[in-house]
Amino acid sequence: MNFQNTNKPSKVVLSVGDESGIGPEIILKALYSNEIPENIEYILVGSKKNLQNTYENLRSLGLENLANPKNLKIQDIEICPSNNDPKSSYGDSSFQYLKKAIEIVKQYPNAALVTGPICKKSWSLAGHYFSGQTEVLAKSCGVKNVGMLFTA
């Protein structure tokens, strides 16, 4: 996919992952970057409240290079409050974020999906028995052979 040579904004949908984990922090740091092309539209899927709380907590620790959630397009799905306990509610939240992100990506033929980290134990506690996000994508898209790319 060539983001640089298009007249329309390309869409990148970001599922924030487990909101009690590092996903929200990673996304807020990444979207602050001045290296992001202007013709890309980012759509975050997650809890607007949690992203705002993460932003405020990180700012209170002295971190400045963060995207302000108030300036981001967020598909708000408020399922549970955030803490650092791998409860089933957090597993269900991250699973629902991924399902919604997949739904959005399917609407746009040139869209990309970025997934934040999840807690597989929380998914299991919530009754979502997939070995990972790649398998959810495969099932949602009706394919048998899948692959995953991890980059940092």
Segments predicted by a language model, with ranges:
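Ligand-binding beta-strand-loop-alpha-helix segment within the catalytic cores
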Residues: L149-A152
